[in-house]
Amino acid sequence: QGELTGLIADNGALVWRGIPFAEPPVGHLRWKAPRPPRPWTGRFSATKNGSACFQGTDLAAPFKDDDGDGFVGSEDCLYLNIFAPANTSSADRLPVMYWIYGGGNVGGHNATPGYDGSVLAQKHQVIVVAVNYRVGTMGWFMHPAFAGSGAGPADRSGNWGTLDTIRAKWFANDITLV
C-alpha cells in the first residue's frame, strides 16, 4: 500500500505498528466483509498501535475502561503490527509468522502486554505479523435482516472476524524490508 516509517524496540528489533489492512468497518461497512484499505501517499507513520476492536471489559483484562461503560476499543480497529529482527533486509528471506491472538473470539488485541512480537523476531530471526480482528457481536453475529444487505455471501456470512484474519494476509504479497 505504500512505504512505512516504524521504530526500533528496546531489544533492537524493527517494529511497525497500526498498519491498516482494511477499510474501517464502520457505518455501512459494519457487519460486512472487510474491504481493502485505501492506499496512502508518501510515508505512513507506523509508530502507534491501532485501537483494540470493540469489546466488553470483562474479557479485555489489560485494557482500561476510561468512561466506565463496560466496553473498550473501537469499531475502527483493523490494523496489524509487524516485527522484524534488527539489521534485516529483503535479501534475508526470513520466515513470516502470522499471529492471531486468542480470546475465544470475544476479546483480545494484537498489542496485548505479554505478547511482544519483537522478542520472537529478535530471538528467532523471524518476521512476526500480529493482526487485529473484530470480536464478539461485531465479528460474529447473524440476523435475518442481513440476508439482503450485502453484495455477496461473505457480507451475509456473520463471520466477519474470520474474514478479517483472511483479509490481513495481503501482507504475504506486499511485505518487503528495505
Where are these regions (language model features)?
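Non-catalytic accessory segments of hydrolases
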Residues: 1-160
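Short, well-structured active-site flanking segments
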Residues: 178
